[in-house]
């Protein structure tokens, strides 16, 4: 039921986003300059998402978690009421043929993507090939996606044109935006650090992520004036955006420890927001620079799939699986040295044992509490070591990409020459 409802919400969200873009263009960019519009649009989209998560966390913290859903239901009912009262019903000029709705193509690509996402998300949990569902979806998902591509390549009136996939700039843009979302999703590692090591609750975790908002604002401001002036090479902007991720990973790699503070994370979160939005806006413009305006909706289709669907779920699955594997590796490594012959381990164990006995626990129960205390310490240490290793690799990769991007000849400058912004949802 949840999957079906989420699918319906996403389906309707596409129409709402298209409607919002059509009217927001007139407000944010009366002259229909794409770079100016994106500098307003993307901060609103990503900033609104962060703000909504904070509001729901505050409601769940201060009230019963059910009230959060009651609040959302009330807002939805109010929105429906406004639509009924204020929106004018525009009758279609002509009847739309059933074949023009492309129901078959929508079903095929939706089913294929849902199965692919299920495999990526639950493959490790269900032990991959030991699960019948995973085996079936691994076979069916690529077949459905290939069938969808075959339909579009042979259709005279395709549901989605494949033209953007043959544009080099569009492919480079999709690739870089997937990298950006892969790096940005690394905040899942930070969430583990906050909850396990610093013992921070959900509300304060989401409050920390509000420091992304100043980064979004600064990134949008930089892009607005960078593309208006167009005095510097495009690769300098990309290298600068990647350097923000270098700073983000460097501060986390050298800064996280059991003695670190919550406030220490404000600055890296800011740089993550700055780098993310700068690169998202830059490559959203770069991907459509040489694209025929009639393919803008097709570009939006592929951009949303690569940037907002596949990249986050791939990154989340990778980080969670890598963190679990490395944590188990370091847990085994550290536990080998935990014996009574080790002075530090023996001291910690005896201290916990004596404290439990002093509190009135029987010896057997006190011994169990002391063992659990030592186990929790090992868990924290293994998590820290696993985080350090992953963040170290991410730091090196981001440095390499930042340096390479500095010398990639994207072009001398990016010239935004479109007369109209277009009805796309990127």
Spans of model-derived segments:
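Helix-loop-helix hairpins in multi-pass membrane proteins, especially solute transporters
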Residues: 1-105
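A generic transmembrane-helix signature of 12-TM secondary carrier transporters
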Residues: 5-6, 73, 79-80, 242, ...
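Cytoplasmic loop-to-transmembrane helix junctions
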Residues: 32-40, 292-302, 386
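Alpha-helical transmembrane segments of multi-pass secondary-active solute transporters
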Residues: 37, 67-72, 133-137, 205, ...
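Small-residue (Gly/Pro/Ala) motifs that create kinks and tight helix-helix packing interfaces
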Residues: 48-60, 64, 120, 223, ...
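Hydrophobic transmembrane-helix bundles of small-molecule transporters
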Residues: 62-180, 187
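12-transmembrane solute porter fold
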Residues: 159-328
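Hydrophobic transmembrane architecture of multi-pass small-molecule transporters
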Residues: 311-410, 416-426
